[in-house]
């Protein structure tokens, strides 16, 4: 089910963001919100980026999570770097896709007492950091990634997303 597709080009030479809303849900961020969050996560990068951002339902989120991660449940965010493992080549864009499962994001925000848009901002930044090579497989990596997310979100005017959980 494809509901709406928006191509947002805030700075054509720097960011080509294709937003694909595949679910009708209340409280979804606007394309300009996603563009601001993606742009903040890219701050300081000199190479351009081509990003696909897909907002999906639980069924599609579960299918993708099972297919690519071997986990048979929907998750909040998935990231797919199209040039993963390749060296950054001058002039070539960072390319990848971020998938957000709207129902999972809304449920988590409610359960954790978080503002829905703040949670979308956090997960969008989290996904963008994965596309740029950040990970959280070890405690050290997780701490570094969480710290970077917190700094980026603070610049956007959001509180520490981990303060609620710790």
From Swiss-Prot:
Signal peptide (from-to): none
Name of the gene: ybeY
Cofactor note (record): Binds 1 zinc ion.
One of the protein's GO biological processes: rRNA processing
Protein name: Endoribonuclease YbeY
Protein family: Belongs to the endoribonuclease YbeY family.
Reported function: Single strand-specific metallo-endoribonuclease involved in late-stage 70S ribosome quality control and in maturation of the 3' terminus of the 16S rRNA.
PROSITE patterns the record matches: UPF0054
Names of required cofactors: Zn(2+)
InterPro entries referenced in this protein's UniProt entry, alphabetically: MetalPrtase_cat_dom_sf_prd, YbeY, YbeY_CS
Leading EC class: hydrolase
Lineage of producing organism: Bacteria, Pseudomonadati, Pseudomonadota, Betaproteobacteria, Neisseriales
Membrane-traversing stretches: none
Single GO MF descriptor: zinc ion binding
EC number(s) from the headed UniProt entry: 3.1.-.-
CC per GO annotation: cytoplasm
Keywords assigned by UniProt, alphabetized: Cytoplasm, Endonuclease, Hydrolase, Metal-binding, Nuclease, Ribosome biogenesis, rRNA processing, Zinc
Native source organism of the sequence: Laribacter hongkongensis (strain HLHK9)
PANTHER family in the cross-refs: ENDORIBONUCLEASE YBEY, CHLOROPLASTIC
Cited NCBIfam families: rRNA maturation RNase YbeY
Major localisation: cytoplasm
Annotated residues for binding of Zn(2+): 126, 130, 136
Subcellular location: Cytoplasm
